[in-house]
Amino acid sequence: MPFLPEPLFQHGQPDRTAILLVNLGTPDGTSPREVGRYLRQFLSDPRVVEIPRAVWWFILNVLIVPLRSRASAHKYESIWLREANMTGSPLLVYSERQAHALQQLLNAQGHDVVVACAMRYGNPSIPSVMQALRKQGVERILVLPMYPQYSGTTTATAFDEVFRVLGEMRNQPELRLVKHFHDDPAYINALHQQVGAYWAQHGAPDFAHGDKLVLSFHGVPRRTLELGDPYHCECLKTGRLLGEALGLQPGQYLVTFQSRFGRAEWLQPYTAPTLEELGRVGTNRVDVFCPGFPADCLETLEEIAMEGQSTFRVAGGKEFHYIPCLNDSEAWIAGIADIALAHLQGWPLTLTHPHVLEASRTRAQSKGAAA
């Protein structure tokens, strides 16, 4: 197997450290063709759908993609950003803003770190971003998936792709991985501040009179829990820690799971039926927050803020509040920095002095080096 071409090496070039923020992915646009291409790549991953490949290939390519692409495209169109300074998929826009803000914060703190974001499916792809980092002289990469709770369906497949790309490199960089941060104080604090800021602006639920806070996490098949995936337990711990930080009693907040796909049983309770039941019993106000999504995306903006609100109100509920994800909030950028720096310990984070680099280049050239 031929290896990827290496960037031209130059003596005196600083060895740099990078943080690679990885998220799930998004289609390039809202056309059925673009959405279908994204769905095919996403759902072809054996980490995501554990069904015999031949059977699943037929289901995916003959049934799911042809039948779901147009409906999914309409959903993406409903949440696509088209503002002057925010254009495109919300997930990509906020991921890029997170990377940019983190870069600025770390640089302001005196750390010479390159920050980039990549998507497991779609663009910017992990291979393209990792190759771009190598061209910037990056010799050390901290892979930080934007999945607070570990799951084989998300975190592991991001690592798989990083390892695959690494295996194609002739001159491999050092690598560190952040497995999860579901109970990291920096993450819990950012969640706490996000909810608190929303309540300070819009008023808090009246928990004494039955209002509820629903913490909705992305669901996975229950079978993954039975096979040893820790995702369910980590979601519950995040929910408990956030509830405690907010000063809530168990019963004032609920942990639910959304985005069920197919007929198999997934982690319960399901979000949509929970919202329907809360509406049916006459709950006056429900606030929904999605702690497992550090950036707003289709699953939060369309499935929860739009469909979830409709489900609750049609069933008889009155006041529905969707609390935005962490996105590029100041507290969250500071939180990512804390998490990253804890995993970067021992790696050089300061830029080598130009005189030292020049001396290195001069010595190399005196020995016959071309550059």
From Swiss-Prot:
Protein EC: 4.98.1.1
Residue numbers binding Fe cation: H218, E299
Main location: cytoplasm
Lyase is among the record's keywords: yes
Family matches, as InterPro entries: Ferrochelatase, Ferrochelatase_AS, Ferrochelatase_C, Ferrochelatase_N
Pfam families, per database record: Ferrochelatase
Pathway where it operates: Porphyrin-containing compound metabolism; protoheme biosynthesis; protoheme from protoporphyrin-IX: step 1/1
GO MF term list: ferrochelatase activity; metal ion binding
GO BP of this protein: heme biosynthetic process
Catalysis performed (reactions): heme b + 2 H(+) = protoporphyrin IX + Fe(2+)
Localization, UniProt: Cytoplasm
Biological role: Catalyzes the ferrous insertion into protoporphyrin IX.
Record's protein name: Ferrochelatase
Species of origin: Ralstonia pickettii (strain 12J)
